[in-house]
Every structure is written in structure tokens, then in C-alpha cells.
Regions:
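Hydrophobic alpha-helical segments
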Residues: 1-156
Length: 156
């Protein structure tokens, strides 16, 4: 059984902790003392229009190069593109469910709600994810061969 603890501090390190972090979560004061980390944290705040820097980024601050690389890639992938922002968040949630990442499920569900996800849409989305998991398991368990009409061939 996992223990749950309520954490809170002045730098936004708050929330219900399901597990103890295996890495240090940087405070705002620590981030300000490192130019690379401070720059990424400032960009996170500016990009999101929020004073909050999530615990994920605070953990990545232990490796400034990884923090910079990951933030840059996430901004690119989740930024403007062909897919609308809500669809991108829903894909992120589905993958997070498949990977069993509660942190990612919660953070991207919050982001999806901020982008307009309704309770009805959320329920329907979760039903689709659940059905996909069920039918994927059945197909894999039964080793059903792929129909010729479904095969994706390389284009010219």
C-alpha cells in the first residue's frame, strides 16, 4: 500500500505525494542561483503564463542540460501545429495511462481541462482508452493476424 502525504511550501512544491522523490526537487532560490536552470524556469513561467514550475521540471533541474533539452523538445512538440492543443493533451494522457505514469496523467489532465476539456469529453475519452486497452489485449492474446487491408505500406 502506498502512503500519501500532503506537502506544501512557499515555492509551489505542494500537492499530494504518492511516493517520495528519488531526486532533489529544486526550490526557486536554488534555481535562481544557477543561470541555466533559472532561464528554463523563467521560460516555463512565461510560456505557460503561470508562476508555477511543476515538480517534474524541479527534478530535471539536477541535470541542467537534460532540463534544457527536455523543455525545448516539449515546447516544440506541444506548441502550435496541425493538431489542436487539446488533442495533443489527450494523446499525452492516453500514452501516460498506457505507461502507468500517474504524475503525467494528472498534469496533462489538468492541462487538458485548462484547454477546454469537459467532464463529458473526459469520460468519453477514458471509455475509448479503456476499450482500446481491452481490444488490444484481446488481439495480442489471440495473436490475430493483421488484415491485408489494414497494413500500412511505405509510400513512393
Amino acid at each position: 500500500m502506498r502512503s500519501r502525504a500532503r506537502a506544501s511550501s512557499e515555492d509551489g512544491l505542494s500537492g499530494e505525494a504518492i511516493a517520495v522523490a528519488t531526486v532533489k526537487l529544486w526550490s526557486d532560490a536554488e534555481a535562481e542561483a544557477d543561470a541555466r536552470v533559472s532561464a528554463v524556469f523563467a521560460d516555463i513561467r512565461a510560456t505557460r503564463g503561470s508562476d508555477v514550475v511543476n515538480n517534474f521540471w524541479r527534478g530535471l533541474a539536477n541535470d541542467p542540460a537534460l532540463l534544457e533539452r527536455t523543455w525545448s523538445a516539449l515546447k516544440t512538440v506541444m506548441g502550435p501545429g496541425t493538431l489542436d492543443p487539446l488533442t495533443k493533451e489527450l494523446v499525452y494522457i492516453a500514452v501516460s495511462i498506457a505507461n502507468g505514469c500517474p504524475y503525467c496523467i494528472h498534469s496533462h489532465t489538468a492541462a487538458a481541462r485548462a484547454k477546454g476539456l469537459t467532464e463529458g469529453q473526459h469520460g468519453e475519452f477514458l471509455a475509448v482508452v479503456g476499450m482500446a486497452n481491452q481490444t488490444n489485449a484481446l488481439v495480442n492474446g489471440m495473436q490475430i493476424p493483421i488484415d491485408a487491408a489494414f497494413r500500412v505500406e511505405e509510400g513512393p
